[in-house]
């Protein structure tokens, strides 16, 4: 009788047991070094599942293979792609048909517990963190903003009798009404939020201006102190002097925090300590190299007899070697315990601790005198140090005011105010300030918060305690904010060229003048008049803006057919020039750039302004400086292009806050305070009957409406003022040309026009538009079926397999698109075309 099916299968499985066990044993050592990540289980399961399906699919036509695949010898087999084995029409097979992502490869990542299977591949910008973690019920996604109709959609709602000019006029009116309605809805939705009121409410705007002006004066005083005490004389904004630049920025921060000259001494102490640490590391490195050299010299002197046991010990297992090492280390530790620890010398360092332990074990002889006198020498040193410490207690120690600790909170809802976060964090020791960023409309107006504490606190303990607190049913999710790593960053060294430096002086002087005038920084009051003083840093600045040339000498020499003696003969390309460095101009420019950075928080070479820097953890954080000289010569075109680019990028900093014109404001619905006050009075004048009128604000009754009106203006004047302030509040928001609003949701435009031309020009697919993330649960648009390329190709940029042929060369006939996303048309005509043959108009 034959064996059962189970016994037969077991025999087949055990056929290569020895081979498999040897293979697994070799892999065990590699797996020991790696952490056991539970996140990889999904990937292994997917790999096994795909292999199983592959085996089951072709089990009829092929014999099973039972030996394991060796990943360390050869890569795993790839699955063959067939025309009939395609899931292009099935939206839940998201291996290669990702229409909205820039990658056509399979989705590597654990499947998300929510939403469409393809959505976890997309970039989840704009999706709240709770939604990405699976807690979608905790998130209020809100109703999507209504989209404005296109002209074509608007025409469908009109009657056929409306002509073209009337339709255009009505569409313009529709656009104005739509924007007005959107603006009013946005105002009503956000008018009670702190960030919105601080921007536009008349009372809050005045307070905000006073605070910003006070902080500007504080920063100005810090800069003037540095300039008067020659802190800026020896520092240049070059990447080689990054340490000196950081020292100047830290000194400015110490002065902003109210520090004194004693507190500034801590910068010198830190500099000396850094030098000492560098010297320790260098000395440890030198001793290590000397030790290696001596060992190499002593190695050939060893007899051959000593080498024989070494060769015999080689095949010892690593486990036994580890046990021997542990046994050796235990008696060494016991011998070190009774002796006291040696004091560190100037040559010792933490980095060289391994080398120190090696030297102690290798040469025990020098330790014997230290063991005898190790107890006496520390006592003598302590006795000598004790009387010196007493006078130090009386002196004031410098404070590290430039260093802080901070907590970062990523998602603060707009309804939580700064005062609430301040009250929450004030209970912890060392609290200093709170900074809130501007709300982000694309992220549901969430804000980022930075809570700054003193350097002496345990910031991790505070962060942990804040993590367990909910504010208005919102988790703050704080994290410890790291210190800035690279505070000084460099840009192109072409900025050292003299014409560029002169142009930068001109732009920086203009920018300083514009920012000072906007902030009224140098305006003082003499009696009733406002007198503007000149910024001392701009004094005699025009002397450096004028270019001096030898025009007369060049003219006389050119008429005689000679060249000036000072001009060197040009070598190489005449259009290229060497970078000329002018130290005098650079010194003037650096003072202007330090003024912009310290006073106005403007990083000139980065062409940006750091907002609310006075409330941030580091009040002078980052600065961009000039890089090293370019190794090659530069062309005139590069110089002019650099000047043009930096002028364009600085243009927004020069621009004054734009407001709408009166006509545009009236079209958008600007309100009149007096008319709104009259409407308020009319709404609060109610007729009860004949000669009976009621004021609902107080509940009093009057004989006529004029008495109610008089009563409201006399007894409820504060209500009238509130109405007028509300009108001014709305008008301030309306007239701001850069007012915040909901991001417009634009529908995806089908490819046409230029896309068709691109296809005709030889491209396989039309250029891809900006990527857009679909709302939760919304199905993706249908992909084209038979005939032609799909509407959204799997990889329009050729970054994966399938698009290689179209990028092999320009001007060639495009290869066959290996598009396995959609099934090809079975009725398509198969043809052969000779590439060397002349063009034929009638080919298929």
Swiss-Prot record:
Q: Which GO terms describe its cellular component?
A: cytoplasm; nuclear body; nucleoplasm
Compositional bias of kind Basic and acidic residues:
16-73, 277-337, 376-397
Q: Which GO terms describe its molecular function?
A: nucleic acid binding
**GO biological process terms, semicolon-separated:** primary miRNA processing
Q: Which UniProt keywords apply?
A: Cytoplasm, Nucleus, RNA-mediated gene silencing
Compartment list: Nucleus, Nucleoplasm; Cytoplasm
Bias type Acidic residues, positions: 349-359
Q: Which residue ranges are recorded for the region named Disordered?
A: 1-90, 277-401, 555-575, 794-825
One Pfam family this chain carries? Answer: SERRATE_Ars2_N
Quote the InterPro entries the UniProt record gives.
Nucleotide-bd_a/b_plait_sf, RBD_domain_sf, SE/Ars2, SERRATE/Ars2_C, SERRATE/Ars2_N
Question: Tell me, what does this protein do in biology?
Answer: Acts as a mediator between the cap-binding complex (CBC) and the primary microRNAs (miRNAs) processing machinery during cell proliferation. Contributes to the stability and delivery of capped primary miRNA transcripts to the primary miRNA processing complex, thereby playing a role in RNA-mediated gene silencing (RNAi) by miRNAs.
Q: What PANTHER family would the database entry show? A: ARSENITE-RESISTANCE PROTEIN 2, SERRATE RNA EFFECTOR MOLECULE HOMOLOG
Q: What subunit structure does UniProt give?
A: Interacts ncbp1/cbp80.
Q: What family name appears in the similarity comment? A: Belongs to the ARS2 family.
- Record's protein name: Serrate RNA effector molecule homolog B
Instruction: Look up and give the organism this protein is from.
Output: Xenopus laevis
**Lineage of the native species?**
Eukaryota, Metazoa, Chordata, Craniata, Vertebrata
